[in-house]
Amino acid sequence: AKLPDAEKSVITDSDKVIATLNSLCIEMDNRYALLAKANVRTIKEYNEEFIHRKLNPNNGHKFMPYIVVIIDEFADLIMMAGRDVEMPIARIAQKARAVGIHMIIATQRPSTTVITGNIKANFPARIAFRVMQMVDSRTILDAPGANQLIGRGDMLFTEGGDLKRIQCAFIDTPEVKRICEYISKQQGYPEPYELPEYKNPDSDAG
């Protein structure tokens, strides 16, 4: 998925990141409106209704693909974009999963200035690899333990309950390329899914 004026789905410009996150919030609200119009509660129920031709495209209905948003090095994004990204990220994490929009954030600096209480409250599923201090483990997992991991993929996982210790698989570059090639050969959309256009109200005011 991408913005209408974007060339690629991978974004590094902070202004475009803010626009994309707010666009995803618009997409989320639009999807909830369609679910309400179709009298269903989840994207799975909605798509089944659409596939079985119980929803008329002339009334605005359309098939909803799943969207996964991945933010690599969340701390850098906070430094570049400030808190402009925190509100849309919290909204997406809190509500969007029911309409097929999922979010993964990653950071190597798990401080409380990066992972705020608002962010933590909306990400019940968390993974921690080895960290240097117990306070970092508590910031991620609300529990100690990640500071005692041995590295090399050793990690702790929680969904808001008990901690589970898991061994993460190592995937090298050639394997990543083979996975990408396999995905690219699958039947799918001929072009990326376009997100709604987002207009920054501050730019209009100027």
Where are these regions (language model features)?
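P-loop NTPase motor-domain active sites and their immediate coupling elements
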Residues: A1-K2, A6-G206
